Amino acid sequence: MKTFAEIAAEIAPQITEMMPWDAEEYLDEHPDTLIVDIRETHEYDTMHIADSLNVPRGILENACEWDFEETEPELVQARKRPVLLACRSGNRTTLAAYTLQLMGYENVMSLKTGLRGWSDYELPLVDIEEKPVDIDDADRYFANKILPEQRKPASP
């Protein structure tokens, strides 16, 4: 059996990952890039990259195809466009980028370190009303909040 982290590490060499500072420059040079935030809607609503499209990971594959209730036409039509995937820490986007490649997306990238890294680099985020998010608020939001009961038990 493999853990999620092991699976992500195994497929990472097969995808393109981009650090936030490189993504900032890339987006300036490629304004046609579709930014897809694959976090859950409540995460996206709290803060996200301006002009990004929210397609939660759980419906991503359906959103990439016609004839589903989850279909996102802009995403379906983006197979030849640059697509930058974002999540909280870059793990979900590793799997998502791999899947999109299998589905025929020609230029899909994963934001390495995710929005946590984006925020650490002090790149702009906006809220649900597209208003700028204060960097300190973003730092607090992206701080690790793993509860004790969520941690792996110590080995006996």
Residues of each region from the PLM?
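Rhodanese-like catalytic fold shared by cysteine-dependent sulfurtransferases
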Residues: M1-T33, T41-P82, N91-P156
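Short, surface-exposed ligand- or partner-binding patches at beta-edge/loop junctions that are enriched
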Residues: A86
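Active-site flanking residues adjacent to catalytic metal/cofactor-binding acidic residues
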Residues: V36
